[in-house]
């Protein structure tokens, strides 16, 4: 488990990256997320390893971590068929976020070890781009993030909520006028 799957999802991602490149848009790629693909609807089975592990267990289980090391290395070495360039060498991909909204219920040392293993896999794969880590969750281990070699941090923000249950209409710019860090005290 943990091998990069050549499928419609990857082809669509490659196509998106090519179109963004055509428009001069540079991006940070989030390598993985560890929850279902259907939120808020039912998940559809895709055969990915993240279905074998709970969102929090995926960051602690040795088999899951080994699968992620294989996957993240394969992802950065993947050659986009539309551009002919690997993700790690694409100048329009400016960096990688290890994962979206990680869950670290364990200790600071376990968290640090997980991040360092992902960083090691990226380095071994030849990545020279900055690597970011999402720090919006798991405040009990946040110091562990900064005891690693990540070059930056990322945050998620749902200024109008995550799911409304209906189509929202109107001007949403006032909702993104200011960001207040919820744990800044």
Name these PLM-found stretches.
Residues 1-150, 182:
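Active-site mouth of glycoside hydrolases
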Residues 100-108, 152, 157-185:
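Active-site clefts of carbohydrate-active enzymes
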């Amino acid at each position: 488990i943990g091998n990069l799957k050549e499928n419609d999802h990857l082809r669509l991602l490659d196509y998106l990256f090519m179109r963004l490149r055509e428009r001069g848009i540079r991006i940070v790629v989030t390598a993985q997320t560890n929850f279902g693909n259907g939120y808020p609807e039912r998940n559809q089975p895709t055969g990915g390893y993240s279905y074998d592990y709970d969102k929090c267990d995926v960051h602690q289980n040795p088999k899951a971590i080994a699968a992620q090391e294989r996957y993240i290395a394969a992802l950065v070495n993947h050659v986009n068929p539309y551009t002919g360039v690997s993700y790690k060498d694409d100048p329009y991909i400016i960096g990688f976020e290890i994962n979206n909204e990680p869950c670290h219920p364990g200790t600071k040392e376990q968290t640090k070890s997980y991040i360092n293993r992902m960083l090691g896999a990226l380095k071994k794969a030849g990545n020279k781009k900055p690597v970011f880590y999402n720090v919006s969750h798991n405040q009990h281990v946040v110091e562990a993030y900064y005891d690693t070699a990540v070059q930056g941090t990322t945050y998620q923000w749902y200024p109008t909520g995550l799911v409304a249950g209906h189509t929202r209409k109107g001007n949403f710019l006032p909702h993104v006028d200011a960001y207040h860090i919820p744990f800044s005290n």
